[in-house]
Regions:
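A short helix-loop-beta-strand connector motif used in the catalytic cores of GNAT acetyltransferases and
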Residues: 50-63
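Conserved alpha-helical substructure of the radical SAM core
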Residues: 34-37
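Acyl-donor (CoA/ACP) binding surface of acyl/acetyltransferases
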Residues: 1-32, 48, 65-174
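Short amphipathic alpha-helix in the helical subdomain of ABC transporter nucleotide-binding domains
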Residues: 40-43
Length: 174
């Protein structure tokens, strides 16, 4: 286990999480910000990328597990993401649709912010969010983040405007 909150724990994903990950990444509505659902090969590539991030950085997107049922309901964690000419430490999150609007993403994202500041000793952490993804924007705001920049990213053959949210360690009480 990497992190624990009141209702959740976050741990590294492993191959046995493939089916749970499919419930997220193969769902059209969940993946609208990515221009569509993934297929099995893309889900496997995503999982492999997280596992290699754990080895390279010591962090990545982690499985979010509901304590009450021991079920993986989403993913949330820290990744290094390209933004214009640099790489940013980003809090990312994506949950099964069944668990939307219950505060789980905010709870997990706040724990990741604390981890970034206290364990990784980061001075700032970001969330890069598509301009049409209102629910994720609300999570970022609840995590004390503000928009600092915008940029059009090219992904899956589509130009997508993204906003860059930031929170700085010196601005928050941990």
């Amino acid at each position: 286990m990497i992190l624990e909150t009141e209702r959740l724990y976050l741990r590294e994903m492993e191959q046995s999480d493939f089916e749970s990950l499919c419930k997220i990444l193969k769902d059209e509505e969940t993946m609208y910000a990515y221009e569509g659902a993934f297929n099995d090969a893309e889900v496997q590539e995503w999982l492999d990328r997280q596992i290699s991030r754990y080895q390279k950085y010591g962090f990545g997107l982690w499985a979010v597990v509901l304590k009450e049922t021991d079920e993986m309901i989403g993913q949330c964690g820290l990744t290094m993401q390209p933004w214009k000419e640099k790489e940013l430490l980003e809090i990312g999150y994506l949950f099964q649709r069944l668990y939307w609007h219950k505060g789980y993403a905010t709870e997990a994202a706040k724990a990741c912010k604390k981890y970034a500041f206290e364990v990784l000793n980061a001075d700032e952490v970001y969330s890069i969010i598509r301009d049409t993804n209102v629910a994720s924007q609300k999570v970022a705001v609840r995590n004390s983040m503000i928009v600092t920049d915008s940029w059009t990213k090219h992904y899956r053959g589509v130009d997508m405007l993204h906003d860059c949210y930031v929170v700085r360690k010196k601005q928050v009480d941990l």
